[in-house]
Amino acid sequence: MAKEKFERTKEHVNVGTIGHVDHGKSTLTSAITCVLAAGLVEGGKAKCFKYEEIDKAPEEKERGITINITHVEYETAKRHYAHVDCPGHADYIKNMITGAAQMDGAILVVSAADGPMPQTREHVLLARQVNVPYIVVFMNKCDMVDDEELLELVELEVRELLSKYEYPGDEVPVIRGSALGALQELEQNSPGKWVESIKELLNAMDEYIPTPQREVDKPFLMPIEDVFSISGRGTVVTGRVERGVLRPGDEVEIVGLREEPLKTVATSIEMFRKVLDEALPGDNIGVLLRGVGKDDVERGQVLAQPGSVKAHKRFRAQVYVLSKEEGGRHTPFFVNYRPQFYFRTADVTGTVVKLPEGVEMVMPGDNVELEVELIAPVALEEGLRFAIREGGRTVGAGVVTKILD
């Protein structure tokens, strides 16, 4: 048998389950895979994952932070989904802030028996902060509630919560169902209304979460890792293409670490010592730049489509501060704390200039919003992830939520 080729015929979308502890996120992830694996959705495909397999999530490291994440994949008739589930509340916060697994849409799981709880709110707020663009709601455990009015009330509360954090609460699909009920129906070989609720959820995901713009279609950007001078030819910068396409002859800008961007032309592109006619996201390339001296460009800048990205010094960010057990600080920090901020390939000293009202200090293990001023401008945009380091160790991870200059 020849090996099956990964077919790129279906659109690819990244999703994940979010919500309060014990509201059934991992059970829902299991139910989705098992309903699809049972062949109950036309054109659907999956391997059935049991709850235990999802709950014992393997550890991953992202920006020096250990996170437990389970990845599953499945297909509907229209799409290929990559789906992430985290067992612990802290894992969610870390995943959302570090962007270890970025989501094009989230499935908010709310227990019909309990309604929205503190972590429900926290996850929705975080989803908004880190730019998760769409949310679909699965009201779980509806088999435990016989009171129609109570279900109406919980749905209303969830919609109000979403609206409060600037999601369109009135339009968001809310599916009533039971993940455990669906798994039990499958076991008894009698798919009924709870399996139907899982199919409804998949349909809502297909219809409501748009296919994201592909990295290839975005404006070109490559963080500069290294700079070489090649005698007789000029200056070459190397790095991995983050997004967009670069072709020889394209105009580019070198942005960051200097007051003004520098315009130049990419005269040739090489990968593995071979000349390329186009560089795509993920390619590790060397780019020969016209008329640029070795001292005009340095690691930490980015090569970008002109006008597509600007350098900034001041920003607001949502930050997760590592606990002592995770190798972070042992003591709190205060306003005027001055660590190193790592953006892509840039590492720049910055000062924490503002903490939230009423917050005097930030403890290891906290998740906090703060304002930072860098000593040199860096190519920044909302949604960009960064690490905070001090004395050679990672002490935090963050995401830019607003540019302030």
From Swiss-Prot:
One Gene Ontology cellular component: cytoplasm
Region (G2): 64-68
G1 as annotated region, ranges: 19-26
Region listing for G5, in residue ranges: 178-180
Pfam families: GTP_EFTU, GTP_EFTU_D2, GTP_EFTU_D3
Region (G3): 85-88
Chief location: cytoplasm
Residue span(s) of domain tr-type G: 10-213
Region span, G4: 140-143
Family annotation (SUPFAM superfamilies): EF-Tu/eEF-1alpha/eIF2-gamma C-terminal domain (SSF50465), P-loop containing nucleoside triphosphate hydrolases (SSF52540), Translation proteins (SSF50447)
Entry's localization field: Cytoplasm
Superkingdom of the source species: Bacteria
Binding site for GTP: 19-26, 85-89, 140-143
Presence of the UniProt keyword Magnesium in the record: yes
The protein's role, per its UniProt record: GTP hydrolase that promotes the GTP-dependent binding of aminoacyl-tRNA to the A-site of ribosomes during protein biosynthesis.
SUBUNIT field: Monomer.
PANTHER family the UniProt entry points to: ELONGATION FACTOR TU, MITOCHONDRIAL, ELONGATION FACTOR TU-RELATED
NCBIfam families for the chain: EF-Tu (TIGR00485), PRK00049.1 (NF000766), PRK12735.1 (NF009372), PRK12736.1 (NF009373), small_GTP (TIGR00231)
Annotated protein name in UniProt: Elongation factor Tu
Organismal lineage: Bacteria, Pseudomonadati, Aquificota, Aquificia, Aquificales
Gene, per the UniProt record: tufA
